[in-house]
Amino acid sequence: MTNLTRRQARRFLLLHHGLIGAYRFRGKQGAYDFVRQAGCIQFDPVDVCGKNAELTLQSRVQGFTKQTLWQLLYRDRLLVDYPDKNLSILPTEDWPYFERYRRSAREGGRQFEGLAEMEERTRQYLRENGPVNSDTLPVEGQMYWHSMIHWSGQWHGQTGAARSVLEQMYSTGELVIHHKEGARKY
């Protein structure tokens, strides 16, 4: 067993996470490698001086740009947006490890009245029209719904039906996020 002082442990962690020393991660491959090493990075839509995922990568990856992350997510599909308690960005290769979450979402979705019918209408609409967001999906009204795997929906009230059905289908893995415009998911 190796014993480390607190100072050595701090230095190791800072080096491991690419926060001190020469850049270990470079360009698009470096951004992907960092997410693989970290396991996931949290997506946070708040953008005061940059979104959390972008700031996380910018501080560790030489040459990182917002376009780099967009390409990894929505063109190359090496990363995917998926809930890991909160919406996170994770390597696509880790998708199988989240089947337990998807199964929980499928099972939990059965309790929400009208959801199955809305999912079927949504599937048909998507086949005919391609990616949509909750404003462009023609599903009206409110419903009782909340995610079984992350903080989305209302536990004690109603939420928009279009948003609910799309979030449910993302949670079950039936849909993945095609792209985002700002924080809007398509």
For each feature predicted by the language model, list its residue ranges.
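Long, low-complexity intrinsically disordered regions
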Residues: 1-186
